[in-house]
């Protein structure tokens, strides 16, 4: 088994992306592997020898779009006192039931498959001994029709349901239903295996289980057949389309090949449909490749020619690395619009790899059109040029210089100069700059940007461009010198000996005419070069070239795409992709312009010094382990854009409990470009579409951390504004002095955080609002040494810790921030994997829920008013008219909230009172309450 596993590891092709695999390892060493056609023979030689030696193997094949008809009859029964006989006999079916199931399959084929022949009905039955699995006795068998291949979707949606109907209606000779002693619905035992991997012959699901073995081969008439007789009717083929030799002597040994579910060179039948299905050969797999056609065909051909030249300069080692190999493929796919010429270029370049597999290239190419067009189409010539520049800048520059006539052919210098086009105007010079810096610079509505290898950074001065102008000028000066040498050389050689014969004079005359023509052309080129040099070295004319560069480098979608991908976040040294959960180099197509303030250090571990210091810090901030775990579980979402859980987090405590230090740690990690502190007015005032709101404008551009701090005692949060900021919907965005027509909406990507000692009142909150709120209590207290308990155990019990006055030093904060970034990514990856496989569950700690319940009670404005203004007596003779209550409520509200006017009218207030105290429409007063005279006294004071 280890030998087979190592074989797959060694031959596993780079050409198969993670979703593309052909075989699955089960048992103690699970995994998915891709087996290329070229490794097919070597694999079966090894596999057959292991099966023949009865070595436990656990390998299954992935089913293709075209599959043989397979049957899996899985019988099991719980063993108790009533059916103890079964435990003793260990028999759940007999030969009669087996033959009956085969007949149901064959009858279904006859009724639903088009143009079937007798050999299509040949069925291989595979069985193994019954076994106990806990309280259950399990037994069953597999069926395999080696000559009958059908479209998988039609097997799933047509054949299997028909078989189940046939099994349900079938009656044995005694009149009993199939498996009547086990279940009244025998069709339930027929499993649909079209979406499952199929065990190879000789393999089992785990090392401790026995494999299924051939017990019988049935003909179309249910007559037993010899193995050689059954497998010699039609030829079988390897994945390389070579015929397999079947003899009486070797038929048992090569059963794993004969019972493979590979569809190569198999005859595929239709299921009651006139549509003709083609045999899936390699040629068939290539049928989707398109020819170059359409209005842009000339542009496509030109780009493909350039791409072919650039691939000659590109480092061939990239063909061995999957990500860059796939990127080059998608680049060529986009350049060539998926045409066959583009594929041919990619296929040839892929052959530089030692792991080259033409089958994988075809399959991956055909899958590329399934990619998200928003992100795949933006990889084109610019991305290819970037790759080449990274690998061979000198070679790329030489290629561009040659394209634009900056390199002379010394072997045929005169002809080369005469054909030379000197760039004396803005347009060709701008095109040259585009070829040199495409993918590295871009001009957008927001100005110039340059790509630094990780992000796009704004550029104020195009210094590189002006330096390049000087470089081109130097090239032209060298050409001017060579032209002068040619002209003077011709003049020196123009004389002829007067004594030459007439034939030589005739030849000399024609050479002088040709030389004169060349001299005229050379002089014209000389003047053009002088004009080009003057243009390239003059500041004013350089500006004209740069203006034309703005036209060629302009990308109208750049500003809209910038920082709009919520699944990408840039560290200082690369990009983390939350779709693939991997850290990688930045790409131009990431369209990121901001980085976190830290580097991602994947060398850190749980035992690293800075990570241990972080764990110690968090354990003091949150002594309660459940609160700490919940805090980290929620806060790890900070890097992923958006607020998919729709949570508003409140950090609260009485002071000196670490809120500010924790916030500073997060600001150090995230950085000023991706974290902003906002005015509390954003939450206390209604967000008005169309009105200028500079605070909201600050949240654009992929901001990940929005903090509301320094709350006033009388400020109230509007639940509507809170819902808008946490709902994930687009927000109106208009800056000061910006025209309404220039404003635009944006989708927020930040996590909302409120930091306060006392929670501000939440106004008009509904259940949906409360569902979003998470109150994180900061319970610790950081005190001076004289107030701090001596032992660590006592400190944690009392939640009193020594105040570390040095923790906010820059180097300490940066070290903790780097560890925090690594830790949050680690937690997010673990959490996301659970989300994707459906096992993620979050438990909100009781302390967090209790804090929210207390907050809800505080925000009940009517309860707050009644508590301060009235006394509950439970005496029904005591009553307060609604009119008097409303007058008192208005006065109380103005005094309690710094002169703010009441937003409830009288009718709304009375309705709120009736709903809270379950009163009817006929009630005009609230009974059981009386005026609190202490409230009057406090007002007088």
From Swiss-Prot:
Compositional bias (Acidic residues): 498-507
GO molecular function, one term: ATP binding
Region (Disordered): 492-514
EC number: 3.6.4.-
Residues the entry annotates as binding ATP: 653-660
Superkingdom as given in the UniProt entry: Viruses
Keywords: ATP-binding, Coiled coil, Helicase, Hydrolase, Nucleotide-binding
Coiled-coil intervals, chain numbering: 285-323
InterPro entries documented for this protein: AEP_C962R, Helicase_SF3_DNA-vir, P-loop_NTPase, Phage/plasmid_primase_P4_C, PriCT_2, Viral_Helicase-Primase_Cplx
SMART domains linked: D5_N
All copies of domain SF3 helicase, residue ranges: 609-791
Family recorded in the similarity comment: Belongs to the IIV-6 184L family.
Protein name, UniProt field: Putative helicase 121R
The species this protein was found in: Invertebrate iridescent virus 3
